[in-house]
Amino acid sequence: MACEIAADRVLAGRVSDNGEMVEMCASRELAPGSVVPDMIEANLRDRNSVYQTIRDSLASVGGRSRDVIAVLPDAAVRVALLGFDALPAKPDEAEAVVRFRLKKSLPFDVDKAKVSYHAQITGKGVRVVAAVVLSNVLEDYEAAFREAGYTPGVVLPSMLAALGAANAEQPTLVVKVDARTTSIAILDKNQLLLFRTLENSRGVTITGEQLAEEVYPSIVFFQDTYSLNLERIFIAGLPESGGAAPALQAQTGAEVRDLVSSSQLGMSTSPIPRWRMAGVVGALVS
């Protein structure tokens, strides 16, 4: 099972036995102000409400296990791509090198943070995808799951979780919008090449033209850096993702579609729209 805590709701899902689709899902709204995603300040302003909503959401998808993938808001986690010639073979030494590189780019003390990273070998060395969250922020989220009766064995920021739903063998842009952020990722051969999280003051009311304008600098940077053209674009988090298609197609010539496909969300009659479920679906089908 996977469960995402967003600013306005909790989403949960249970994967099918073959691991190819989410066969049950649930969504429960939170009272305004219950969760305020932030990298520094306390996120859970009404802990009782949050853990009760987690419990109700996961109970409704009916999983037998008490282990869950916890998906956190993107505004609470810093994700960075770092390049190295090489990393030390010992994990603790490698983490120390990653932490040192992160030090100057964070709005908080890296020594007070949890760091998780994945190293990708490239032709030029090592590319590291690092996720960083303040320890007290992470502990609050994990405690909410435990109070609800579940064990958060894996914890992911929403955008990194959502990437699990994308087939990115070809140059692929993934854009995910929420109430606080617009997250942009570009992948090729299922390797993450670019990752950015931008402040989003318009929330899900952002228009297709506005979204294309925000994304365009990242597209240009990718094309200039890698001499590749995007072939596919996936959108998540917008009720009318088709509204962004004409502007993005005009910029890139790439096909634009919803990130979560109908085949990945088995409950075709579910009242929960696919555009809300990217984090949960990606965490489970990756």
Task: Identify the meaning behind each predicted range.
Residues 1-286:
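Hydrophobic/aromatic-enriched cytosolic interaction surfaces used to assemble or bind macromolecules
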